[in-house]
């Protein structure tokens, strides 16, 4: 498992959910291998409780289209049935919305919804205020961050807005800062976003990604975090500040309001 820097998810009963990368899948033939699968593990001993494997797993494995490049996101309880859902996507760019109380094994019976309206995902989706955020990409071409509405236990078929420009591989790890359900800001780190190769921290209106609020290339060299260097660092927002690790520049950049 790798999830491009994302960690396992856990529900209120302490069950653990994670995705796996390319490899052998032979559970349907009494084997023990779970390549390109979502696993649900018990608390404590981490015993296998349930799993989901796409019906095209053999294609994913043969073409290096890891499901495990994307992390697993558990969604808040829904008023509709099924009310406990998870969402993920992998390199193929196919989003899976799944009933996490019955993952379905090697069938598509418990897939509540599929959506192919993103490029391949390297990272974990982001959720805020009935919205889902993705920043997909491929090894050879970029894509832009986009947001889908999420209502009635289903996501919209098409993005409600998307950011201008493209994010090259590996896309972006994104996080939302907000005052509850108000004043949402989506933060994203764009790799190699300047002509000099520096990475750029960008802030968008979380309700309309077409509205950029800030980017770290606006003030010359003052705000540039440098070349991050590693592929899958996660940015962190806490107490009014944004923290960006930069192994390439051997520093931790901290962004906040100037006083």
Sequence positions of predicted segments:
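Acidic/polar loop-and-plug regions of large Gram-negative outer-membrane beta-barrel proteins
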Residues: 6
């Amino acid at each position: 498992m790798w999830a491009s820097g994302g960690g396992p998810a856990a529900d209120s009963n302490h069950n653990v959910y994670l995705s796996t990368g390319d490899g052998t899948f032979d559970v349907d033939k009494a084997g023990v291998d779970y390549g390109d699968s979502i696993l649900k593990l018990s608390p404590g001993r981490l015993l296998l409780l349930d799993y989901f494997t796409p019906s095209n797993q053999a294609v994913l494995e043969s073409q290096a289209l890891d499901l495990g490049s994307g992390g697993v996101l558990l969604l808040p309880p829904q008023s509709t049935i099924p009310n406990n859902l998870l969402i993920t996507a992998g390199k193929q760019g196919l989003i899976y919305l799944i009933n996490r109380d019955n993952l379905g094994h090697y069938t598509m019976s418990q897939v509540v919804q599929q959506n192919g309206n993103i490029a391949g995902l390297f990272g974990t989706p982001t959720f805020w205020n009935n919205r889902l955020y993705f920043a997909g990409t491929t090894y050879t071409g970029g894509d832009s961050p986009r947001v889908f509405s999420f209502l009635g236990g289903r996501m919209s078929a098409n993005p409600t807005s998307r950011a201008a420009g493209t994010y090259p591989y590996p896309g972006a790890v994104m996080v939302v800062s907000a005052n509850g359900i108000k004043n949402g800001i989506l933060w994203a780190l764009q790799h190699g976003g300047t002509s000099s190769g520096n990475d750029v921290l960008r802030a968008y209106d979380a309700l309309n990604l077409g509205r950029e609020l800030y980017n770290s290339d606006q003030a010359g060299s003052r705000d540039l975090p440098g070349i991050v260097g590693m592929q899958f660092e996660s940015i962190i927002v806490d107490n009014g500040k944004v923290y960006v690790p930069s192994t390439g520049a051997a520093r931790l950049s901290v962004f906040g309001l100037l006083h």
